[in-house]
Amino acid sequence: MEAWLGSLLFLATMVIASKAVCSIENREIFPNQMSDDCMDADGNKHFLNTPWKKNCTWCSCDKTSITCCTNATRPLSYDKDNCDVQFHPENCTYSVVDRKNPGKTCRVDSWTM
C-alpha cells in the first residue's frame, strides 16, 4: 500500500507541477530480476519507488507498474517546408528555426505534449 501511495504521489506531483503527459505500463518481472527492482526499456535496473530521468522523461516504478511522465511540449503547427525542429535536451525544450537561416526562428501556431 505504501508503494502504491508513493507512486501515486509521484504521478500527481508530475502532472500538477508540469502539466505533464504520463504513461503507465505493467511491470514485467524477469527470471533473474530481484523483487525490489524494476527494469526500464533499455534494460537498466532501478529500485522500487525511486524516480529516474532519461531523455526528459521522469519515471518511477512500484510492485506492479512503471509510470513515466514528460513535460516537453513539441511544435505541432509550423511551416514544415521551410523550418526545422531542434530539440534541446539540456532543458527539455524544442525550437523551430528557418532551414536556410538557423539563426532565425519560425512562427509556431500550436504546441502539443
UniProtKB/Swiss-Prot annotation:
InterPro entries reported in the protein's UniProt record: PSP94
UniProtKB keywords: Disulfide bond, Secreted, Signal
Annotated Gene Ontology cellular component terms: extracellular region
Major location category of this protein: secreted
Signal peptide: 1-20
Keyword Signal: yes
Compartments in which it is found: Secreted
Disulfide bridge positions per record: 22-69, 38-61, 56-92, 59-68, 83-106
Gene3D superfamilies: 2.20.25.590, Complement Module, domain 1
Similarity remark: Belongs to the beta-microseminoprotein family.
The protein's assembly and partners: Homodimer; Interacts with PI16.
Protein name, UniProt field: Beta-microseminoprotein
